[in-house]
Regions:
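Short, well-structured active-site flanking segments
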Residues: 188-203, 323-325, 444-447
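Hydrophobic single-pass membrane-targeting/anchoring helices
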Residues: 29-98, 527, 531
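Active-site-adjacent helix/loop patches that line small-molecule binding or acyl-intermediate pockets
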Residues: 197-203, 208-268, 276-306, 354-393
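N-terminal targeting leaders characterized by basic, low-complexity, disordered sequences
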Residues: 1-22
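Beta-lactamase-like hydrolase cores
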Residues: 85-169, 239-248
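A small/polar active-site loop signature that marks catalytic segments
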Residues: 277, 283-445
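Small-residue-rich helix-loop
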Residues: 381-531
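Active-site SXXK
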Residues: 159, 173-191, 281, 309-310, ...
């Protein structure tokens, strides 16, 4: 994503300060005048998919998802799906299972079910490298791309590279770094791992500590797109209050513990609306507005604000709170301050995040930087490295090295890709995706199902027009910084084979033109049928 100019940073500071001012109470609107509840993305997308299946069932049965011209028949449902432009929705009560595949782009997911070593969705031979080069070489020379450019295409069924130009060059990956973060986190912590936020009470005291576990999706909101699946600070307050009352306690000293994370909280790019401070405790990603994704004004103290909100929620449950008398930096007699829970502290209550696989999907679909940094630290934690930027760098590298992935020249200065010091190669990005698409690694499936679908979801919702051959076919993670554009993902070609690709370029001067050039390359891979 583009870096901020000085005036933009100043404007962000003004917005943050404004967001911290008390807000007037919202007027009550009669129920009869309220707008109907907005349908969730999966409901809209699934509805469009159902209509498309009903209309095209006969054609698909006869000829699969492609018509005689090589156009994907599901594209006729494009218009209906545009209303769902927010990306994969994880709303609803979360089960212990990994998330189901997004209902869009079934041809891509169909290829994922093939046995290892098969054609991944088709029995036709892999594309011919020379023929594919004849299509991609001219596109890679597009003047909209910067002076440094690289591209790799791999046949997922065989693992064979069918196209490569500068694939081993370590370039700035921008947000495609999140693919590496996702694979490392899922490999080290596991797809079913959940992040815990808890409350404890010190023995023989009324000292209650809110302990952050690093859950970036913890929410204090009553309603929201993730309120049904994300861990709720409100639920934690209710359960904590119940446990305290069972002990005969209705007045406590409240503090909060963020000691799980070490090192600098501030991302190297400085204060920025693209992410909050990297803290083990936050609610709603420290957002000062009602957004759930994208840039937003952020709190300068997400942990303190979350603890303050928790105190308010406890008081709503009849528990009077005060600051821990021994806490450093307490603000006044009622606001909780930071502390560290002792090993002897007794559990009161806890809430857990959705499975890591669901967090990965949300991160990739919306390019969520807060989740990315949290997953990098979960990787460090699982790898027994310091839970910091440096520790996460070592942990991600170590996990990918275990998987024997190509790491020459790589650096993970952060987990999100916002740091321009990050380095990756098209060879690594494509290898990560090929591994995630391999049925031998079901723990990585959410890396593929979380990729935005061209013209349908997440950061690709506006990138592909409805008449583009890549619409609904290309699934890819985008990456954008000033002068940097990347695209890495999967397609199922006209012969039904699953291919993975990674395209990188630096030194671009027109981001829209560069994005268009990369999108055309991905579409060309999907429609080539090169022999």
């Amino acid at each position: 994503m583009p870096e901020l100019k000085p005036w933009q940073k100043t404007w962000q500071q003004v917005r943050r300060l404004a967001g911290q001012l008390p807000k007037p109470p919202a007027p009550k609107i009669p129920a009869a005048l309220r707008a109907p509840a907005k349908l969730k993305t999966w409901q809209l997308t699934a509805g469009a998919a159902t209509v498309g299946l009903a209309v095209a069932a006969g054609a698909v049965a006869a000829a699969g998802p492609w018509d005689s011209s090589g156009q994907r028949t599901a594209e006729r449902d494009w218009a209906a799906s545009q209303e769902a432009g927010g990306g994969t929705d994880h709303g609803g009560r979360t089960s212990g299972r990994a998330p189901a595949a997004a209902p869009s782009a079934p041809s891509v997911l169909r290829g994922l079910g093939a046995p290892v070593g098969s054609a991944h969705g088709g029995s036709a031979p892999a594309p011919d490298g020379k023929a594919l080069a004849g299509v991609l070489d001219p596109l890679l020379k597009d003047k909209a791309l910067g002076p440094e450019r690289s591209a790799v295409v791999i046949d997922a069924g065989t693992g064979r590279r069918v196209y490569g130009k500068g694939g081993g060059d370590a370039l700035t990956p921008a947000s495609t770094t999140k693919i590496a973060t996702a694979v490392a986190a899922l490999t080290s912590a596991g797809a079913d791992h959940r992040i815990t936020t808890k409350t404890v009470i010190e023995p023989d005291s009324k000292d209650v500590v809110l302990v952050g576990g690093g859950d970036p999706t913890l929410t204090a909101r009553k309603d929201g797109p993730y309120s049904g699946s994300a861990a709720s600070l409100r639920e934690l307050a209710e359960d904590t209050a119940r446990a305290l009352k069972d002990r005969g306690t209705d007045k406590v000293n409240l503090s909060y513990d963020t000691s799980l994370y070490t090192g600098e909280q501030q991302h190297p790019i400085g204060p920025n609306e693209n992410l909050t401070l990297v803290s083990a405790l936050m609610a709603d990603e420290g957002r000062l507005d009602d957004s759930s994704s994208g840039p937003a004004p952020r709190s300068g103290d997400p942990a303190g604000d979350a603890a303050k909100k928790f105190a308010e929620l406890l008081e709503e449950q009849g528990i009077e709170t005060g600051a821990d008398a021994g806490a450093k930096g307490k603000k006044d007699g009622r606001e909780p301050g930071p502390s560290k829970a002792s090993d002897r502290a007794e559990s009161l209550a806890k809430v857990e995040s959705a499975p890591l696989s669901a967090l990965v999907e949300r991160m990739l679909t919306h390019s969520d930087n807060d989740i990315a940094e949290a997953l990098a630290r979960q990787t460090a934690l699982a790898s027994k490295e310091p839970v910091s930027f440096d520790g996460a760098d070592k942990a991600i590298n170590a996990q990918l090295k275990k998987a024997q992935l190509p790491l020459k020249g790589t650096k993970f200065a952060d987990g999100s890709g916002l740091d321009r010091a990050d380095r990756s190669s098209a060879e690594l990005l494509s290898a990560l995706l090929a591994r995630a698409a391999d049925p031998a690694h079901p723990e990585l499936r959410s890396v593929v199902t979380g990729l935005p679908v061209a013209g349908f979801t997440g950061t690709l919702v506006d990138r592909y027009p409805k008449d583009s051959p890549g619409t609904g076919v290309v699934r890819a993670k985008t990456g954008t910084l000033t002068g940097v554009n990347t695209l890495a993902g999967t397609v199922v070609d006209t012969d039904g084979r699953l291919l993975v690709f990674a395209f990188m370029t630096t030194g671009t001067t027109d981001p829209k033109a560069a994005q268009g050039a990369l999108d055309r390359m991905a579409s060309a891979v999907a429609t080539c049928g090169c022999r």
